[in-house]
Amino acid sequence: MEWTQIFIPIVVSFAITVSVMPLFIGYFQMKKQGQVTREDGPTWHSVKTGTPTMGGVVFLVASLITSLAMGLFFHQFTPSLLIILFILVLYGLLGYLDDFIKVFKKRNMGLNSRQKLIGQIFGGLVFYFVYRSEGFSDTLDLFGVAEVPLGIFYGVFIIFWLVGFSNAVNLTDGIDGLVAGLGTISFGTYAIIAWKQQQFDVVIICLSVIGGLIGFFPYNRKPAKIFMGDVGSLALGGLLAAISIILHQEWTLLLIGLVYVCETASVILQVASFKLFGRRIFKMSPIHHHFEMCGWSEWKIDFVFWSVGLICSGITLWILF
């Protein structure tokens, strides 16, 4: 795969997304179905009630079709490509079921946490067994300094990594355009890492997702015409975790995905502080809602969080190369 060919997956996935998204939005508007605002969410987000959701279906399908087609075209139809795409499909389906229940069954909480966790763990187990059957290493890279052999416990780590980051990205998806922008930066960084490792199958997936996210962004930027839904955010988080594992650069996701980590940490700290001390650390969690309550606009939050993601990704590449 030549560097001049990197635009092909981006353009194909982008074209599919921008072509189908207006039809998808039109369908939801015709059915008068849309986002159901959570009762524990910010009150000012009530104006977003009824906005079409599940836009992740479009850019995920575009990414899937493009990855498979380009994998065949560039002779990169590998086990790595297929197992990563398996996570895309499974976690996407989990998110789809969650969104479907919220939108069409009018239950604002969707699947319960136990149901989601069972599906996420199942995906992690399948990923691990395929990963080991293909002879991949069961050692954990510790910040490029040392490698620790985990044996069967690497399977536990894989499950933790996939579940943790799929939920982290899901928590981050609460501001118009935020995850679409952060995702583009994150997958762009992993495309560079994969290119340096000559794992072109992973490059194809990253570029396909980037094309889909770029095509989705004009419809998701404030004021959003459509949200990606859990179908998009759960799949994107699972994909990032799976890619970091396949590239054997797991630690990099802590830095590349620092915003996702901080969003999750803010929720954990908020809950722990309230239960232990009866006090809240933040005005609201995840932390992007805290900044909203401090008077920041959604665009300002987007810009600051994207900047953090870009800087952290740059530092990661500097450390590696």
Swiss-Prot record:
Question: Transmembrane region positions?
Answer: 6-26, 54-74, 77-97, 117-137, 143-163, 175-195, 200-220, 226-246, 251-271, 301-321
**Membrane topology qualifier:** Multi-pass membrane protein
Instruction: Look up the domain of life of the source.
Output: Bacteria
Q: Which reaction does it catalyse?
A: UDP-N-acetyl-alpha-D-muramoyl-L-alanyl-gamma-D-glutamyl-L-lysyl-D-alanyl-D-alanine + di-trans,octa-cis-undecaprenyl phosphate = Mur2Ac(oyl-L-Ala-gamma-D-Glu-L-Lys-D-Ala-D-Ala)-di-trans,octa-cis-undecaprenyl diphosphate + UMP
Which UniProt keywords are present, listed alphabetically?
A: Cell cycle, Cell division, Cell membrane, Cell shape, Cell wall biogenesis/degradation, Magnesium, Membrane, Metal-binding, Peptidoglycan synthesis, Transferase, Transmembrane, Transmembrane helix
Annotated family: Belongs to the glycosyltransferase 4 family. MraY subfamily.
The protein's name is: Phospho-N-acetylmuramoyl-pentapeptide-transferase
